[in-house]
Design a protein with these regions (language model features):
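RNA-interacting cores
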Residues: 1-178
Length: 178
């Protein structure tokens, strides 16, 4: 299970995305061996997509998080939910966004063999920033959300969230935290 951000420090134009010398993205994973494989692949071939080449790699340790930590989204959260067999996209416009986000994350914790007790994810009450965004991936339109959040729990639970991201499809660039 891993997470990666969208490109940061870029400028969108009609012609496409312009990168600068300080543009970057980050990749995080709960299992360090995944990061080692990714870094090895980048070092073998630094070409990414659309002619972008990696010019440097920095490896950082997981920060020491407090039992309540605020995060911004480095990529929008994709949250899909099945209601009576029908798939729906849950966004910040839905009353049950926080509830479904918590259930989704508790499932990730449980699947990783980690404790789910005491974890709580909520929209940051000190921020008025809220945005929904339609993101097309492989021809599929996905309704996503960008919103500052607060995660309360153990340092292990919060570190796990930071490492694997929130919501669905974190391995293809959704739900990364910064």
């Amino acid at each position: 299970v891993l997470s990666f951000s969208w490109l940061q420090n870029t400028k969108a134009t009609k012609e496409g995305i312009n990168l600068s010398n300080n543009s970057f993205l980050f990749i995080s994973a709960w299992d360090d061996s995944i990061i080692k494989k990714i870094v090895s692949g980048i070092l073998d071939d630094p070409t990414m997509f659309c002619g972008i080449k990696v010019s440097g790699v920095q490896i950082a340790n997981t920060p020491d998080f407090k039992n309540s930590t605020s995060f911004l989204m480095a990529s929008p959260v994709l949250l899909k939910w099945r209601d009576n067999g029908a798939l729906r996209y849950v966004t910040i416009e839905d009353e049950d966004f926080e509830e479904k986000l918590n259930i989704n994350f508790k499932n990730k914790l449980q699947n990783a063999g980690l404790d789910t007790e005491g974890i709580k994810i909520s929209i940051d009450p000190n921020s008025t920033y809220r945005q929904t965004k339609m993101v097309t991936y492989n021809g599929i339109k996905n309704r996503t959300s960008l919103v500052p959040i607060v995660i309360e729990g153990t340092t292990e639970q919060i570190s796990f969230a930071w490492s694997v991201g929130l919501g669905n499809s974190t391995g293809i660039g959704f739900g990364a935290l910064k």
